């Protein structure tokens, strides 16, 4: 059992699964019903994830065949776009760094989850790969994403490539968008 200032070792020898939340759970000294409700929802999804019932790292994503196929197709499309942009503008490698810094464990969903987190998508819902993508599209700043469009068409300037390098998380969102 772990708590603030308390760590007790498992002396029973029984198999134990440690469940940790990806998200900041708020102030423990100040009780807020909304925060408690949010934490219970996140804890439920963290438990399902720990026992392999759902996938994702930050978001609760369905692990069924359709959602998994969508995740695989998404990652393949993302990798193709990223490779094409990286070959034209090597400075955009910072999107790779943003993805690594996000420390997402589900490789197929990592770009989508990192972009959704940066866009402020609510983690207390159960998603399929498709509905998480739709939630991201609804939450992201479309004008800002469109400002990176010349990088994808090959008509970009050095200034736009530099902006992508300076804003790796935003550029990662644009790659997902």
Residue positions per predicted region:
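Patatin-like phospholipase
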Residues: 1-177
